[in-house]
Design a protein with these regions (language model features):
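Catalytic machinery of carbohydrate-active enzymes
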Residues: 1-341
Length: 341
């Protein structure tokens, strides 16, 4: 039923308490009729012989066109739509509004747990602010804040969202067809998902990373990452990483393993740092990882967040990508996959 669906959505998106019940501050000039876009579209309707029509201004698609007396309308769509709202009382139009973000306070709240997915979104934030000329703020619920501040200092960060803004977006990535997500993310490259969610049909230019620390050594080095969010993404060829590390060292490179953990257990597998790699594992700030990758000769990793950071700082990425399709993440000419295993 409706209550179950709303609670399911709130839990899935890790949304703040009160998002469904919070006061709608947007006045319409008609008593009791209030509108904002802090959870898709939110509209309070007073008692009376009202008819509400909600549509997509750009396509003309009608989402809702019914008579209603009292209550609150919520849309589940968590992506950019140029909403058009028309309200009639006794068949006379009393209110009409088309979503317009220009000059308005707008929040984007990231509840995505994996920082690689967040990194894929980042270039679209600046572009979204530029296109709509809105007062954009971003809320992150993971450890990317310091790195984002370095890359996009013009975008303020906030600790929590409130509901007195004009609009709030909750980007999500799902491997399924739910109405509040525009697409199953397996159907397009990750570096296009942010554009689809925020209504941008091109890939923006990445921010230019400026290192905040010098190289950890004057010798040439390569960074590697043998772990991912799940061990099924990892390279499971027996002794494969040891072969790679030995080869790189014979070429004169130092090899730094920069995973969070020296050992990761899951999915029936144990993934360990290669013995020949120098141990730079640990829960280090992402800005520190970004600096290390910026100064590295190149990076060898998986379909994981560290690959996204490497790409963000223009460190060449050699991606062992058998878990995902060749087009799924970002473009790199250095992809290694054996589709027979």
């Amino acid at each position: 039923d409706q209550v179950f669906l709303l609670e399911y959505i709130k839990d899935l998106l890790k949304m703040p308490e009160g998002v469904f019940e919070a006061k709608i501050w947007g006045e319409t000039g008609f008593p009791g009729l209030r509108l904002d876009f802090n959870f898709g579209l939110r509209l309070d309707i007073p008692e009376g012989n009202f008819r509400v029509k909600i549509s997509d201004f750009d396509s003309g698609m009608v989402f809702f066109d019914k008579h209603i007396s009292g209550g609150r309308l919520l849309s589940v769509d968590q992506y950019f739509i140029r909403w058009q709202v028309e309200v009639f009382l006794d068949d006379e139009k009393i209110f009409s509004h088309v979503l317009n973000l220009e000059g308005q306070p707008v929040n984007i709240m990231f509840r995505i747990p994996t920082f690689g997915d967040v990194m894929a979104f980042l270039p679209y934030l600046r572009e979204f602010k530029k296109i709509h000329r809105c007062k954009l703020s971003v809320c992150f619920k993971n450890n990317v804040g310091e790195l984002v501040s370095q890359l996009y200092p013009e975008i303020p960060q906030i600790d929590e969202v409130n509901f007195d803004t004009y609009a709030t977006y909750y980007p999500i990535m799902l491997m399924s067809d739910f109405p509040f997500a525009l697409v199953d993310i397996r159907h397009l490259p990750m570096n296009r998902v942010g554009g689809l969610v925020l209504g941008i049909d091109y890939i923006p230019t990445k921010a230019v990373f400026k290192p905040t620390e010098p190289p950890v050594t004057d010798e040439p080095y390569v960074c590697i990452s043998v772990q991912a969010s799940i061990n099924r993404k990892c390279w499971l060829y027996p002794g494969g990483w040891d072969i790679v590390v030995d080869y790189l060292k014979n070429l004169g490179y130092r090899v730094f393993c920069i995973d969070r953990e020296a050992e990761q257990v899951g999915d029936g597998f144990t993934i360990r740092k290669p013995e020949g790699a120098e141990d730079f594992t640990g829960n280090h700030p992402l800005i520190e990882r970004a600096n290390m990758l910026y100064h590295a000769e190149f990076f060898i990793g998986l379909s994981s967040g560290l690959s996204w950071i490497a790409d963000t700082v223009d460190c060449p990425v050699v991606m062992i990508c058998g878990f995902s399709q060749d087009w799924f993440e970002f473009y790199t000419p250095y992809r290694v996959a054996n589709r027979l295993v």
